[in-house]
A protein has these predicted regions:
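Topology signature of small-to-medium multi-pass alpha-helical membrane proteins
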Residues: 1-143
Length: 143
């Protein structure tokens, strides 16, 4: 390996931040699985209404966001440059997923103002993970 392609030594906190990123994306995967396998009989009327109003493309974007995001964070821990691309796709999918709350009237009508807090936090955390990967690549920490 020459000096241009050899990864540089990483900051001591890199591994902790990468593992925290994996945990965040893994929680997203668990949330996705819980929602797509939910027993409709156990849900409240409001929860069923939200599921019924959600378009198929929202669920597809949700799946892409969490599973590609998990792959991206694993690549980040392994210090692979591919992490940036995967996490960029994940971020785009999160934006598509949560745009449904603005674009689909039934979803918007069913959501309370408090219901928008979680999507905003998820977008911010996903952006932070993407930025972490991008910044790590710029610093030469990824190969």
């Amino acid at each position: 390996m020459d000096d241009d392609t050899a990864p540089r030594a990483v900051a001591g906190w890199f591994k902790i931040a990468a593992i925290a990123s994996i945990a965040f994306m893994a929680l997203g995967c668990v949330s996705y699985l819980m929602q797509v396998t939910a027993d409709r009989e156990q849900l409240t009327v409001d929860q069923r209404a939200l599921l019924d109003a959600a378009p198929t493309w929202m669920w597809a974007a949700f799946a892409v966001a969490v599973w590609v995001g998990l792959a991206g964070t694993i690549a980040l821990l392994l210090r692979k440059r591919l992490a940036v691309n995967l996490l960029g796709v994940s971020l785009a999918a999160v934006l598509v997923q949560f745009s449904s709350y603005l674009l689909v009237r039934q979803l918007r009508d069913l959501m309370s103002l408090d219901g928008f807090v979680v999507p905003v936090v998820i977008v911010l955390l996903t952006w932070t993970v993407f930025w972490f990967a991008w910044s790590s690549r710029k610093k030469g920490w990824l190969n």
